[in-house]
A protein has these predicted regions:
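An acidic-aromatic substrate-binding cleft motif
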Residues: 174-224, 229-249
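The substrate-binding groove and active-site-proximal loops of carbohydrate-active enzymes
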Residues: 148-149, 210-227, 244-253, 291-306, ...
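Bacterial Sec-dependent N-terminal signal peptides
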Residues: 1-47
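Contiguous, structured surface segment used for ligand recognition
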Residues: 44-196
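Gly/Pro-rich turn-and-neighbor structural signature
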Residues: 257-260, 267-268, 295-354
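Core alpha/beta catalytic barrel or barrel-like domain that forms the active/cofactor pocket
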Residues: 198-213, 235-250, 272-296, 318-337
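Extracytoplasmic/secreted proteins, especially bacterial periplasmic and envelope-associated proteins
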Residues: 74-77, 81, 85, 154-161, ...
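Aromatic-lined substrate-binding rim segments of carbohydrate-active enzymes
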Residues: 253-277
Length: 354
């Protein structure tokens, strides 16, 4: 009989529950089961050690991290998180640098000249990454730790794999998991990789957010809605857990309309946004509810032109971003559709939306 370790039990608990800090009292709210289906906490073999290894990455208490200025914005978010993580773990001063000979090199094929050059020189095996989805390799080349991704999320996952193996839990923020302290951080030679994920889209839905989460956000950020500062912290958690998708809170909040930076931040960080329930076509219901008089009744048979305009604006707004569009229609505020609604009407709605 295999008895699970305490760490394994804790990992499963953390996958199910977000712990929220509200007035110094722990509050909890349950995440959607979508979080659980395929988020791997760590899949690559162990390559970090703290006593000895092939490469000491924080020698002289300084760590330089190189990334191409032309790499994806999400890689920059993750690289800067790595700077903070190294400082938390070891106390060493970490910085982003333009020096290609930095201790750590992170980059995405096709977006990082340094990574592309290493592949061309056959210093790293590009066949492990080319044409792959959300895959990374971590290896030592000469005296440099290289983290290369097949795409932006592959690179991001590789960066956060290093953070986790150093001792930074994905839940360091939302569950107050203590960060480990180590004076020295070594990495061992080898090729460490993970991906492609078996499930293409993996994420969470912020469900039943009031009053706990909404109160915490108001007390923390002074807003009546989740702005990009709040969502950036949630997006980071999703990515550290190898997720890539999110459905935002919807009761009284409007993700797209409350803060224009919300959609931009999600796309920059590499999180695919979507909507659910009664929010089709990348529109939040609050965008309609706050102006019912202007939009008219939520009834496709009686108000088709205005609702088509409402839907069209959502699609136009999301242009150039990576999102999943929900189609169909439910009743106003997630109520039942009108009595005259039938499958033929729903078919027409979906055909029009397409």
């Amino acid at each position: 009989m295999n008895i699970p370790t305490f760490a394994a039990i804790k990992q499963q608990i953390h996958k199910h529950i977000f712990y929220m800090r509200l007035n110094n009292i722990k509050k909890v709210f349950l995440a959607s089961s979508a979080l659980l289906s395929a988020m791997s906490m760590s899949a690559a073999e162990r390559f970090v050690s703290f006593k000895q290894g092939d490469l000491l990455i924080n020698g002289n208490d300084k760590v330089e991290i190189y990334m191409d200025a032309n790499d994806c914005r999400g890689v920059s978010y993750a690289a800067n998180a790595l700077v903070r993580d190294i400082s938390k773990v070891s106390g060493s001063q970490a910085t982003i640098t333009s020096n290609r000979k930095a201790t750590i090199l992170v980059g995405t094929i096709g977006h990082s000249a340094a990574i592309d050059q290493l592949i061309k020189q056959k210093r790293i095996n590009g066949n492990l990454l080319k044409g792959k989805r959300e895959k990374f390799i971590i290896t030592v080349v000469d005296k440099q730790l290289v983290i290369a991704g097949s795409d932006r999320r592959g690179t991001i996952y590789g960066i956060y794999e290093l953070s986790q193996q150093m001792g930074v839990s994905p839940w360091y923020d939302w569950a107050d998991v203590p960060v480990e302290h180590h004076d020295s951080i070594f990495v061992n030679k080898g090729i460490y990789t993970d991906g492609e994920p078996a499930v293409r889209y993996r994420g969470i839905f912020l469900n039943d957010e009031a009053p706990c989460l909404t109160s915490w956000v108001k007390n923390t950020y002074g807003t009546e809605y989740g702005d990009h500062r709040f969502y950036q912290r949630v997006f980071e958690l999703v990515l550290r857990l190898r997720g890539n998708m999110m459905w935002p809170a919807m009761w009284g909040w409007a993700f797209y309309a409350d803060d224009a930076e919300n959609e931009k931040t999600a796309d920059e960080m590499g999180v695919v946004m979507s909507t659910s329930h009664h929010e089709p076509m990348a529109r939040n219901h609050q965008e309609y509810a706050r102006n019912r008089k202007g939009w008219g009744p939520w009834n496709y048979q009686k108000n088709k032109a205005n609702l088509q305009k409402f839907f069209r604006e959502g699609i136009e707004r999301m242009k150039g971003t990576e999102q999943i569009v929900t189609i169909g229609m439910r009743g106003d505020g997630d109520e039942a559709m009108s009595e005259e609604a039938d499958t033929r009407l729903m078919t027409n709605i979906i055909n029009d939306q397409r």
